[in-house]
Amino acid sequence: MLKAQKLTLAVLIQATLISSAYASEQSESKGFVEDATASVLLRNGFISRDKKNVAPGDDTSSWVQSIMFNAESGFTKGTVGVAVGVIGDYSFKLGPNKHSGNQMIPWENDNRSDPYNQWARGGAYIKARASNTTLTYGTQVLDIPVLASNTIRMVPEYFTGTLITSHEIKNLEVIAGKFTKDQMSDQIATDQNNLKRAYVWGAKYKFNDQLSGSYYGLDSKDALTRHYADVNFKQPLSADSSLTYDLSGYHTEWDKGASASISKYDDTSSDRSNNIWALSATYNKGPHTVMLAYQQSTGNSAYDYGENADGFQSIYLPNSYLSDFNGRGEKSLQLQYNVDLGAFGVPGLSFTTAYVYGWDINTYAYNNTANTTRNAKESEFFNQFKYTVQSGFAKGVSLRLRESIYRNSDSYAAIYMPDTNETRIFLDIPIKFF
């Protein structure tokens, strides 16, 4: 891993030295106050999971109101610019939420019987920028395939550490960072996941208007190493149609003693590893988009993420909905259809439907060998409407309605998730102050 980190650092240094060939972001800075921004996002969210064939009380539902804020100064002028910012959130539950869960509400105790009534979290960060390279230190929301913050619940997952992002070469982004704290969406303590230290590095490059690629790596102390790669090719077919191919995948190796869900591994092995990859083809014509995706997982472990402070959204693969279709040995196939209903007189409204089917899941379970099988199955039928106001005083307000119907084999339900009908309703109201 050290060789990869040194290579990334060398690329950052070389990119800085040749930055004169590309316009400088820092030279365009207007000032500490002049470029300052401040905004608030009001989010009302509801998630309900109706679980089948379970004991009374095992269903989970959560209803929460959150206020997320972000304020950031502009960069000071000069060769090296400095900026500061704060990020945070305040939330309160709506109703008793006695059976809450789903990473929505933190709990007062370990037996998950007493959810918080209200809670607040947050942090600060500082940035330094030279040319087109920015160093950020402090509390951050990460969008890195191998270390990605969960942003699909009420409030984001926060990481604390240092991240360098460089755009010194046109169409190339290079990153390198070190993080020492991880706070998930439903956690109060800033390092409740006990992250020791995680190094990340990587790059993405746009070769031309049709072809792009990326690679990212993660080395988390006493936990795991992970690599991710992606290649995307878009083939124009006509003025309003195209065909896009995408190949992506992860290779992960876990250290001995790393955390794991019982559904994810063969407990007879002390060396856990996994390869998971996906190939998709997406056809677009006007407002219509159809995607066909195949995904496959191999190794003595499933693709396990989030258990080791490695980001609860670190699965940049197409077959991820309520289930991620990432079981041990699993193969899955998805058919998805999306339509932009703006073309039919309703600007801002879209509809997505998808069906995913997974098979050949190895369900060996710790102390539960009666459920051993190599051909368990799962399926999910997904539907979502999303509407975003396009103009007027409410411009940017969005409403998302999502429903999933999930079913699986009894052997997989025993160690993963029972048959479940899930409903999600999220209303987002963004407010920009300056």
For each feature predicted by the language model, list its residue ranges.
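Beta-barrel outer-membrane channel/assembly domains of diderm bacteria
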Residues: 2, 12-139, 339, 384-390, ...
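Residues on the lipid-exposed face of transmembrane beta-strands in outer-membrane beta-barrel proteins
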Residues: 40, 67-73, 124-128, 162-166, ...
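Outer-membrane beta-barrel translocator domains and adjoining extracellular loop/strand segments
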Residues: 51-56, 95-100, 146-154, 185-193, ...
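Repeated loop/turn-to-beta-strand initiation elements of outer-membrane beta-barrel proteins
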Residues: 78-82, 132-136, 171-175, 183, ...
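Residues that define the transmembrane beta-barrel architecture of outer-membrane proteins
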Residues: 34, 61-67, 118-122, 156-160, ...
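Transmembrane beta-strand segments that form the barrel wall of outer-membrane beta-barrel proteins
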Residues: 44-46, 135-149, 174-181, 201-203, ...
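C-terminal structural cap/anchor segments
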Residues: 299-376, 380-383
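Outer-membrane beta-barrel translocator/channel fold
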Residues: 92, 175-192, 219, 238-324, ...
